[in-house]
C-alpha cells in the first residue's frame, strides 16, 4: 500500500501525512545476541487511545508548492487509499471511520483542493474490507468490489457514482481482481465459482455478460497479466500437483507454452507413498464446513485411530484449499504413517463462503471458531 500517488500527467503528487505527536508510546524488549535485551519504543494507539492525525496534501511540480486538502466534513478518519482518476485534476480518496464499518469514496478537485463529491458509500454491520480493486475507466466511470450482496462481487458505476451495474453474481466469491482491458472490454478476475476450495481465472464483459472460465485444471490458479492484457502467466497447483507455470492467451485461456513444471518432484514423491487429502464437508452447528482428511495408507474402517486436528481460524482465512501444501503437509504425512488420522476443518469466521459466514466472529473472536472445532471433534469421534 502506497501513501502517495502521481496523477496521469505526472505534474502533481498526492500524499498522506501522519502526525503521531499525541499517540501513546509502547515499549518492547528485543532479545538479540547480547546478554541483555534492548528496548524499542514506538508509537502504538491501543483501542480507545488517540490515533495519529492524518492529513492529505497535494504537491504541484510547476509551482513547487504543497497544499493541504480540505476534508472538513470528516473527523477521526482513516485514509486507506488514494488514487487519481483519468482526469489530471480529480483525485479519489477513500475515507473510513475508526470503527471501520463505513467507507466513503470521495473526489477531490486539485484546482482548489476541496472535496467535491461523495462518489460512493459502503456500510457494513461488522467492518468494510479495504482492497485495491478500484479502477477508473477513460470516461471516469469506475469498477468497484463489494460484499453488499452477501458475497464479494464486482460492480461498475458511472462517473457520478450512479447507475450501478453488478458484473458478477452468485453464491461464490471474487477472490482477486486483475484489471480491465479497454481494447476487448473484458474484466479479468479470480474466483471460487468452481467451489470454495478451488480458484480459477475468469473474464467477464464490462456489460456483465459472457462470463468465461479461462483455466481448466481444478485446483488453485492465479494469474499475472501482461500490461496489454494479451497474455497471462498462470500458476497452478492442487493437493496432488506441485506448482506448474504456463503462458496463456488472455482471450481464450489457451496454453501457449509451459514455462516450468515440477515433474521431477512429483516422480520423486511417488517413492514415499504419500496419503492423499480427502476433501469433504461436515455439518456442524447448522453449517456445512469444508474439511480435509488424511488417513494412514493401510486405513481399516473397522479399527479405531487417534485423531489429530489441525486448524487456523483467523477472519477470512482458509486452510481447507485444493492447493499444494507447505511444511505442515509433510509433518501430517509423518503422523499418518505413525497411524494417526489428520483432519482440518474451516469453521465459522474463515473465508470464501460469504460475508455472513466470515464476519459473524466480529467482536466475538474465539467463540464460534472454538465451538465449531469442539463440535467437529465430537462428531468425528462419534463416527463408527
Task: Map each language-model feature to its residues.
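Long hydrophobic segments that form regular secondary structure
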Residues: 67, 72-75, 79-97
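A short beta-strand motif characteristic of beta-propeller blades
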Residues: 67-71, 117-124, 163-168, 210-215
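Serine-hydrolase catalytic core recognition
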Residues: 25, 88, 222-384
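Short loop/turn segments that connect beta-strands within beta-propeller blades
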Residues: 60-64, 110-113, 158-162, 205-209, ...
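Blade-terminus and WD-like Trp-Asp/Gly-His loop motifs, strongest in beta-propeller folds
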Residues: 3-12, 81-91, 133-141, 178-185, ...
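A flexible loop/linker signature enriched in serine peptidases of the S9 family
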Residues: 1, 16-53, 73-76, 95-106, ...
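Predominantly five- to eight-bladed beta-propeller fold
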Residues: 1-6, 12-68, 251-267, 319-329
Amino acid at each position: 500500500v502506497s501513501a502517495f500517488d502521481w496523477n496521469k500527467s505526472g505534474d502533481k503528487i498526492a500524499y498522506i501525512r501522519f502526525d503521531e505527536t499525541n499517540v501513546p508510546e509502547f515499549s518492547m524488549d528485543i532479545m538479540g545476541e547480547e546478554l541483555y535485551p534492548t528496548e524499542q519504543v514506538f508509537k502504538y494507539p491501543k483501542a480507545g487511545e488517540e490515533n495519529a492525525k492524518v492529513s492529505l496534501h497535494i504537491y504541484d511540480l510547476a509551482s513547487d508548492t504543497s497544499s493541504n486538502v480540505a476534508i472538513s466534513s470528516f473527523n477521526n478518519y482513516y485514509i486507506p487509499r488514494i488514487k487519481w482518476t483519468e482526469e489530471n485534476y480529480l483525485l479519489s480518496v477513500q475515507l473510513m471511520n475508526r470503527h471501520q464499518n463505513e467507507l466513503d469514496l470521495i473526489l477531490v478537485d486539485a484546482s482548489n483542493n476541496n472535496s467535491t463529491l461523495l462518489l460512493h458509500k459502503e456500510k457494513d454491520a461488522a467492518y468494510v474490507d479495504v482492497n485495491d480493486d478500484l479502477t477508473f475507466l477513460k470516461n471516469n466511470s469506475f469498477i468497484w468490489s463489494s460484499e453488499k450482496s452477501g458475497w464479494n462481487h464486482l460492480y461498475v458505476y458511472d462517473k457520478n457514482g450512479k447507475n450501478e451495474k453488478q458484473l458478477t453474481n452468485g453464491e461464490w466469491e471474487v477472490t482477486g481482481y486483475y484489471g480491465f482491458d479497454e481494447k476487448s472490454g473484458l474484466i479479468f478476475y479470480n474466483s471460487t465459482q468452481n467451489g470454495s476450495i478451488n480458484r480459477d481465472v475468469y473474464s467477464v464483459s464490462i456489460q456483465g455478460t459472457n462470463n468465461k472460465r479461462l483455466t481448466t485444471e481444478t485446483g488453485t490458479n492465479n494469474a499475472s497479466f501482461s500490461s496489454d492484457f494479451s497474455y497471462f502467466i498462470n500458476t497452478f497447483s492442487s493437493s496432488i500437483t506441485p506448482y506448474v507455470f504456463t503462458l496463456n492467451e488472455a482471450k481464450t485461456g489457451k496454453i501457449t507454452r509451459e514455462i516450468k513444471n515440477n515433474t521431477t518432484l512429483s516422480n520423486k514423491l511417488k517413492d514415499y507413498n504419500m496419503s492423499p487429502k480427502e476433501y469433504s464437508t461436515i455439518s456442524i452447528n447448522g453449517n456445512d464446513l469444508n474439511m480435509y482428511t488424511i488417513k494412514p495408507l493401510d486405513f481399516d474402517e473397522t479399527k479405531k485411530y487417534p485423531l489429530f486436528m489441525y486448524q487456523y481460524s483467523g477472519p477470512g482465512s482458509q486452510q481447507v484449499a485444493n492447493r499444494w501444501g507447505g511444511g505442515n503437509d509433510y509433518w501430517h504425512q509423518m503422523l499418518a504413517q505413525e497411524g494417526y488420522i489428520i483432519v482440518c476443518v474451516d469453521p465459522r469466521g474463515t473465508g470464501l463462503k460469504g460475508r455472513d459466514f466470515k464476519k459473524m466472529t466480529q467482536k466475538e473472536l474465539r467463540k464460534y471458531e472454538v465451538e465449531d472445532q469442539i463440535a467437529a471433534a465430537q462428531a468425528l469421534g462419534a463416527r463408527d
